A protein has these predicted regions:
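Extracytoplasmic small-molecule ligand-binding "clamshell" domains
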Residues: 49-130
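Periplasmic-binding protein-like
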Residues: 149-156, 224-265, 284-303
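N-terminal secretory signal peptides
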Residues: 1-6, 10-26
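Ligand-binding clefts/hinges and TM-proximal coupling segments of bilobed small-molecule sensing domains
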Residues: 29, 181-198, 235-237, 265-303
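Flexible hinge/capping segments at coil-to-helix
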Residues: 156-173
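Bacterial lipoprotein signal-peptidase II cleavage site
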Residues: 27-38
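Extended ligand-binding regions for polar small-molecule ligands
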Residues: 28, 41, 51, 91-100, ...
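A ligand-binding cleft/hinge motif common to bilobed small-molecule-binding domains
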Residues: 117, 131-139, 209-243
């Protein structure tokens, strides 16, 4: 497995250290709908007009269903398993949110490029789709407290391992996913690198496998997982740019829901919920060595 070519120190530099807390039990499924089919329709009057585009906390509780945007093709964070059920790190968290809200979770499949749109149009109440916090995004949506650390990384075939973005060959294409921090970062910091853009994680992975680009830039957690799960690939750049955090997002101005999520994240930190989430959904991919570097408990990143 080519993941072994990445030093632990290099990986940690891209992810940083986070504070840890205490313990937790797994979330129950009785208060959430895990079927992929359940995400095909949006529950409640989410898409209202004007400033009422979002549903408040009380409106969500009254409806009995919370619409949560998650990935359906990004294993191990959000994906649909062989039984048609949503699984992954973000989904595990989403089910707990729904349970503690006392409502059912209606999962709505999202792509990276439409996460903001789905909030702005009221298609979802919450985005839990590996959403990296950036100043630009914070102008359009409201982010809750973080629950994970992340940086960017670059994966490429063993036959031509990319270890630097300097002196780039103008004929070589870099694969990115539209709407991701990788696209934004490369466009700004490396404008001379041609970008081959795709709408989903599945199509980006297929593009790399088919040789449509020399490398794929994305969250380092994602490219490391890809290299571990697919022989013949190496993460030659495990840390690119600065360390960032991943957090839930709600529609701009939805303070009642935002405040509730922040309080929930703090409360879950007292139970070490996200360590439990990691051990249930991510440990097979990243192992136990990186748990404390990836997990953010109680919203206290870099504490």
């Amino acid at each position: 497995m080519k993941i072994n070519k990445i030093s632990r120190r290099a990986f940690l530099l891209g992810l940083g250290a986070v504070s840890t807390a205490a313990l937790l039990s797994a979330c129950g499924g009785s208060a959430s709908s895990s079927s992929a089919a359940s995400g095909s329709a949006v529950s409640g009057s989410a898409a209202a007009a004007g400033s009422d585009v979002f549903r408040t906390l009380d409106e969500i509780k009254a409806d009995g269903t919370v619409n949560i945007g998650v990935f359906s093709d990004k294993n191990p964070f959000g994906y649909v398993d062989e039984n048609g059920e949503y699984q992954g790190y973000d989904v595990y968290f989403a089910r707990r949110l729904a349970e503690d809200l006392g409502v059912e979770a209606n999962f709505v499949s999202t792509e990276a490029a439409n996460r903001i749109e789905y909030l702005q149009t009221g298609k979802v109440d919450i985005i839990l789709a590996n959403f990296t916090v950036t100043p630009e995004r914070a102008e359009e949506v409201d982010f809750a407290l973080p629950y994970m650390n992340v940086a960017l990384g670059v994966v490429s075939p063993d036959s031509n391992v990319i270890t630097s973005l300097d002196n780039w060959n103008a004929d070589d294409q870099m694969i990115v996913i539209s709407g991701t921090t990788a696209e934004t970062y490369l466009t700004k910091e490396y404008p001379d690198i041609p970008l081959q853009k795709y709408d989903s994680y599945a199509t980006a992975k297929n593009a790399l496998e088919n040789g449509n680009g020399v490398a794929w830039a994305n969250d380092n957690t994602e490219v490391i997982a890809f290299a571990k799960q697919n022989s013949g690939y190496t993460v030659g750049i495990p840390s690119l740019g600065s360390q960032d955090t991943i957090a839930p997002a709600v529609s701009k101005g939805n303070t009642t829901l935002l405040d509730w999520i922040n309080d929930e994240i703090k409360s879950l930190g007292e139970e070490s919920f996200f360590h439990k989430d990691y051990e249930e959904t991510l440990v097979d991919t990243y192992g136990l060595d990186y748990e404390d570097e990836l997990v953010v408990e109680g919203g206290e990143a870099n504490a």
